Amino acid sequence: MGSRPIVGIITNEIVNFNGRQISHSTGKRYVKSVMEFADVVPVLIPSSIPSDNLDEILENIHGVLLTGGRANVEPHHYGGSKFPADEPIDPDRDRTVLNIIPKCVSKKMPIFGICRGIQEINVSFGGTLFYRVHQQDGKFDHRMPRNEDATLEEIFKLKHRVDFTDNSYFKELINKNNFVVNSLHGQGIDKLGNDLVVEANSEDGLIEAISIKNYPSFSIAVQWHAEYHPERKENFLNKKLFESFGKACLKYKS
């Protein structure tokens, strides 16, 4: 067996060719980031998979990355109001991820959540979500540009500051009190889940990063897209996160 740990990357259900083909897919940057900065071997976990198959996968990997996705977690998982009919959903991913999180926790396996991933962890621990953050009093518009011709640089540009909480993991990691991040999300954390800890808040008070209380391994989840060019100087925190995740996976493997 190879010396590097294996990380399972959650996929999304993508509908192609007017519904004639459905694929399990994830963004190339997630795969690239875990290979280059976490130094792990990536495998893709289908967004639709039986629980017993999932158990077999978890026996053979050493960490899980919960990726972002176009669809939002359906509100019936946290007692919210029903989505409008045109809201993108991914019920298979909802079921799979809300199943995989407690399995990972029971194994004390490293877990890293990004964008939708932080929301899934919060819901898994009994928390709730805002459907539209920008419609809440005092909250910013955290969404990406709405125009069709927006460039990737415009979509992923650094948008707002996040402030680290008093005993935040991030303060220890980079010896700073805050950091500037991108922002591409419509939903966000409302009520914090049980046994979760707030690690960072945005300037408008929205929860931007969490961890699992007293977890013996890496359990960081962030609302921003840490996978976007971690190698850039302005994104050095994100590079550190992937490196720390990789070290935790290696420790878990050993």
Language-model regions: role of each:
Residues C115:
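Conserved G/P- and acidic residue-centered "switch" motifs that form tight phosphate/ATP-binding loops
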Residues M1-F112, V123, G127-F130, H134-L173, ...:
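N-terminal beta1-alpha1 cap of cysteine-dependent amidohydrolase-like domains
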Residues N177, Y215-S217:
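A short helix-to-beta-strand connector/capping loop
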Residues I220-Q223:
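Active-site-proximal beta-strand elements of phosphoester/diester hydrolases
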Residues S183:
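Short, basic/aromatic recognition patches
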Residues I118:
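The feature captures the ABC ATPase H-loop/switch
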